[in-house]
Amino acid sequence: VNALLYHWGRESIPELKEGQVSKILSNRRPGIVHRLDKETSGIIITAKNHDTEEFLSAQFRNHSSIVKEYIAICIGRPQHQHGIIQTNIIRDPKERKRFKAVVGTEEGKPAESYYECISCYGEYSLMKVRINTGRTHQIRVHMKYLNCPILGDGIYAHQDKKFPKATLMLNARLLKIKIPGKEELSIFKSPTPERFIEVMKVLKRDYTK
């Protein structure tokens, strides 16, 4: 983020006095048009100037033309090979750090996720998820709702006996978005993280699909 401050230039950032950088960053976060949960890896796009920031941000706000795809290693097998999860998401009244999926109520914010089970190994599943909204913890909450919490999720899943040291197995692997000056969607891809590769090696060794 500090690098983005530099790229935005003096004309867009007020003259700074010592100790003011953190305050401006917390209020403005220049160039940051979307975010990932703390332990989620993968693609994040930023802007170098205000016009580009507005152009990109509008697509995230309106969910227009943009495609966001993730992969996740989950604990459990989904009942169906693929499907759409449509719920509202609210903050869990019993635990303020958690969110939960609810249906049949106007409470909370609507959230929609499309999932596809790529393969299963024992009681683990490799999932592809595309989100049509961008709620906090959306994929993590929806996988929990599906009874397939994400491996390594310290909030929505129990510590796994087979992979007790696993971190959150969620990776933003693909982003399709319009960028200024181009008519067609630009495609950005993230390589598979090493931690995913190591877990998949163990699953393929110990289980058949």
Outline where the language-model segments fall.
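Short secondary-structure boundary/capping segments
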Residues: 22-24, 35, 62-64, 103, ...
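Residue-level signal for inorganic ion chemistry
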Residues: 4, 45, 72, 115, ...
